[in-house]
């Protein structure tokens, strides 16, 4: 049997999630699967009648995690479950949905095919890093999409010295700097004119946000290196600077603080229904104006 124990995870703030989650739980039970509901999802979405589990229990026992919500919901679930190796499948109950690629109305059909073994798996990298003040580590976190260093208030720019494996790259004056994974290259990085990286690439991309020097362009680097970014100045920034690991924020950066970023030792495994195509997702989500040929598989 494929995926005998399935965990359900939903976006806590979403209204109206109880009905589709309950229907999904019923469908899974009828298919002979044991269903676990993540604790906050059960509490806030009102899903009852199924065993409730915290992240650790899900990580130790679940063979598949079904995440209903937007990409942000998947990011949070992925950070929790990546160390356990639990694969995830995303059902879009949000907005754009690059990671939650299954529309809500197709959830039962798509999940049914996956449970029958008609699926393809895709491994993606995470980032890990921290904030150092001298020899003391002030903060640590992981990120699926990106690590973003930016000014926290109005006015002025931040100045950052960037090194890769100890080799000086540049000193950047900008509103911010994005370090994105291939997964994150279609998120904030894309809106800052960064390139799209194929998810199979072993790479990261550094994208400046409103740099002072217009010749400062995004640069793609191997994910095998360690980035060190030292905040050298904050100009006339009124409040300070912050660093964000996905949606996790450290907002007390001071001049001289060092931010380290590198590839995490574990990966995320996403499960897609058979026939999934990254390029098809790009065409749909970004509305690329292609002239398809009759032989093209568009979906």
From Swiss-Prot:
Annotated source species: Bordetella pertussis (strain Tohama I / ATCC BAA-589 / NCTC 13251)
Cofactor(s) the protein needs: a divalent metal cation
Enzyme active site: 71
Pfam families in the record: NAD_kinase (PF01513), NAD_kinase_C (PF20143)
Role according to the record: Involved in the regulation of the intracellular balance of NAD and NADP, and is a key enzyme in the biosynthesis of NADP. Catalyzes specifically the phosphorylation on 2'-hydroxyl of the adenosine moiety of NAD to yield NADP.
UniProt entry tagged with the keyword Transferase: yes
Reaction(s) catalysed by this chain's protein: NAD(+) + ATP = ADP + NADP(+) + H(+)
Residue positions binding NAD(+): 71-72, 145-146, 173, 175, 186-191, 210, 248
Family: Belongs to the NAD kinase family.
Main localisation: cytoplasm
Cellular compartment(s): Cytoplasm
GO cellular component: cytoplasm
Protein's name according to its UniProt entry: NAD kinase
GO biological process per UniProt: NAD metabolic process; NADP biosynthetic process
EC number(s) reported in the record: 2.7.1.23
Alphabetized GO MF terms: ATP binding; metal ion binding; NAD binding; NAD+ kinase activity
HAMAP family on file: NAD_kinase (MF_00361)
InterPro entries: ATP-NAD_kinase_N (IPR017438), ATP-NAD_kinase_PpnK-typ_C (IPR017437), NAD/diacylglycerol_kinase_sf (IPR016064), NADK (IPR002504)
Highest taxon above the source species: Bacteria
Name of encoding gene: nadK
SUPFAM superfamilies from the UniProt entry: NAD kinase/diacylglycerol kinase-like
Keyword set, alphabetical order: ATP-binding, Cytoplasm, Kinase, NAD, NADP, Nucleotide-binding, Transferase
Coiled-coil stretches noted in the UniProt entry, renumbered to this chain: none
